[in-house]
A protein has these predicted regions:
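Catalytic cores of nucleotide-sugar-dependent glycosyltransferases that transfer UDP/GDP/TDP-activated
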Residues: 1-272
């Protein structure tokens, strides 16, 4: 039987970033799914907290050199790679000096969110899609973990909907209880509107007068995973998911088997 291809795009991943629910859980997923017979590609931002020397990151010249446009500004995309400790899996890091050189992840040293977090999210999501196109590797599943990946379901279902490489992929969005998924305001909508997307395309991300990145991602994704215990499956943004499959939060000792069964059910639903 041909291996299923899983594209994992995450904002955080242990051991490169540590100390959050998402980094610790997502850090366990690659080896687990590889052991279950899945073929994986893993992408994440190269935040300034990632120790390049310790983790032996090096540039992938054939993938680097693209310019990613965000709100009519061009930003060079650099791709680096490292081997995930304890496995033969590789992690691809998306880097840009303006967005990711700083030695903090989403907030400054006073706890204030970076003003350009929306720009960084748009750059990362578009850059991830363009990188996978260069891979020439059509995934069966695209798992997007965390608010910074919340634009991926939108982009894949609109701006990139005619790309053959993504034609058969199911998009799964993982929502976590983090303090940044409501940030950005009108700046978010301005920066997120790549490739001539309109206000109508971005409307699902509106939450009253503000932003809900989880709500927008749930609207465009094929399935949703609840990654934090504090997020209940009855939260308002899940209403836009309709009858889409939802995997509720599960304690650590049940999470990995729960993921596996969830993915099996998604495979069966396509085959039915």
């Amino acid at each position: 039987m041909e291996k299923k291809r899983l594209l994992l795009i995450t904002q955080e991943l242990a051991p490169y970033t540590e100390g959050t629910d998402i980094s610790e859980l997502v850090g366990k997923l690659p080896k687990f799914f590889a052991d279950q017979g899945y073929e994986l590609r893993i992408l994440m931002p190269r935040f300034g907290v990632v120790n390049e020397r310790r983790h032996r990151l090096h540039e992938v010249v054939r993938l680097s050199g693209m310019n990613i446009i965000v709100d009519d500004d061009d930003y060079p995309l650099l791709i680096k790679v490292a081997s995930l400790p304890g496995s033969r899996l590789q992690v691809y890091f998306l880097d840009n000096e303006e967005f990711f050189k700083r030695k903090m992840v989403f907030e400054d040293d006073k706890g204030h969110p970076f003003e350009d977090n929306a720009d960084r999210a748009a750059f990362f999501c578009k850059g991830a899609i363009e990188t996978v196109k260069k891979f020439g590797w059509p995934p069966d599943f695209i798992m997007c973990q965390g608010w910074m990946t919340s634009l991926l379901p939108l982009y894949l279902r609109t701006a990139y909907k005619t790309e053959p490489i993504f034609a058969n992929a199911q998009i799964i969005y993982g929502a976590y209880d983090t303090p940044h998924e409501h940030e950005g305001g009108e700046r978010f909508f301005q920066k997120a509107a790549i490739n001539n997307l309109t206000k109508k395309h971005l409307e699902p991300y509106r939450n009253g007068e503000g932003v809900s990145m989880h709500k927008g991602a749930a609207h465009y994704a094929d399935a949703v995973i609840i990654g934090s215990e504090s997020l209940d499956t009855n939260v308002p943004y899940l209403s836009v998911a309709g009858d889409k499959p939802v995997l509720p939060w599960q304690p650590a000792d049940e999470a990995l088997p729960g993921y596996l069964e969830f993915f099996k059910s998604l495979t069966e639903s396509v085959a039915a």
